[in-house]
């Protein structure tokens, strides 16, 4: 039996990187957290803190590169920006640890209401995942684990 010949458009789609064939989705959600920014921040920015609620394991490598391990698979990211006790952003890299155009990123921002003193965690997940319901459920579960750790 002969191998089917793919139309040119299908062949091009197979050869293009995934980032060139998909559009990214920006998902944002906020959670009230009963913990001070000073207590919460290390759980968002340090490998040991992240490993307690966010993924299986986190290793800090050279040049502020993080190796996030989910299901025994490595996902590399750079700490792109941070403000102590305020925010942290991880920009994901390819498997060779190189920057990518339109890369996935994850942004955690801690906000405190001056009026009520309530602390909020804003999660911004910019990725290929487009199912808002699935993302909401995933982040609800992860942040619930985080709340249990920080007592809030």
Model-derived features: positions:
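A short, structured loop/turn motif at beta-sheet edges
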Residues: 37-38, 80-86, 110-120
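Glycine-rich portal/gate segments that line the openings of hydrophobic small-molecule binding cavities
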Residues: 51-96
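Short, surface-exposed coil-to-beta transition loops
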Residues: 28, 73-77, 100-107
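Beta-strand/loop substructures that line and gate deep hydrophobic ligand-binding cavities in soluble
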Residues: 95-148, 152
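Hydrophobic ligand-binding cavity/cleft-lining segments
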Residues: 5-59
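Generic structural detector for well-ordered beta-strands
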Residues: 30-34, 67-69, 78, 109
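Hydrophobic pocket/interface hotspot
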Residues: 40-41, 50, 79, 90, ...
């Amino acid at each position: 039996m002969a191998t089917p010949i793919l139309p040119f458009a299908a062949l091009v789609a197979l050869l293009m990187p995934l980032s060139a064939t998909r559009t990214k989705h920006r998902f944002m959600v906020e959670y009230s957290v009963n913990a001070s920014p000073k207590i919460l921040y290390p759980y968002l920015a340090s490998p040991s803190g992240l490993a307690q609620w966010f993924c299986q394991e986190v290793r800090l490598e050279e040049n502020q590169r993080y190796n996030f391990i989910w299901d025994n698979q490595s996902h590399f990211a750079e700490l792109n920006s941070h403000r102590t006790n305020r925010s942290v952003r991880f920009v994901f890299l390819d498997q060779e640890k190189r920057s990518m155009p339109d890369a996935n990123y994850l942004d955690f921002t801690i906000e405190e209401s001056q009026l009520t003193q309530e602390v909020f965690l804003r999660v911004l997940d910019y990725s290929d995942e487009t199912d808002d319901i699935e993302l909401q459920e995933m982040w609800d579960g992860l942040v619930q684990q985080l709340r249990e750790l920080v007592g809030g």
